[in-house]
């Protein structure tokens, strides 16, 4: 089973300085473990938007292959 999670990231940009963003991570979840299989960084600036997005991805059982397209 695939599970999506939002992850808070502390980043730095020469133009913006330090800032906080949220990435989207896909995990392959097994009964005894979970493994990160895909990470897309710096997707959202708002935590609520990131949480809502991963909730929809999990609810719709989105394939990791489609994650880049859905984010765009």
Which stretches of residues belong to each language-model region?
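Short N-terminal "domain-start" leader segments
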Residues: 1-23
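Short intrinsically disordered, low-complexity segments
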Residues: 30, 51-54, 67
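A short, exposed loop/beta-hairpin motif centered on an aromatic-Gly-Thr core
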Residues: 35-52, 57
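Short, mixed-charge low-complexity intrinsically disordered segments
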Residues: 60-72
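Short, low-complexity, polar/charged sequence segments that are solvent-exposed and flexible
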Residues: 23-26, 42-46, 60-62
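Short aromatic-glycine-(Arg/Gly/Cys) micro-motifs in beta-strand/loop hairpins
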Residues: 15-37
């Amino acid at each position: 089973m695939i599970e999506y999670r939002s992850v808070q990231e502390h980043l730095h940009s020469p133009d913006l300085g330090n800032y906080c963003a949220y990435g989207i991570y896909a995990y392959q979840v097994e009964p005894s473990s979970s493994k990160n299989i895909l990470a897309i960084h710096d997707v959202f600036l708002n935590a609520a938007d990131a949480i809502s997005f991963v909730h929809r991805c999990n609810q719709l059982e989105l394939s990791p292959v489609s994650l880049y397209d859905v984010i765009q």
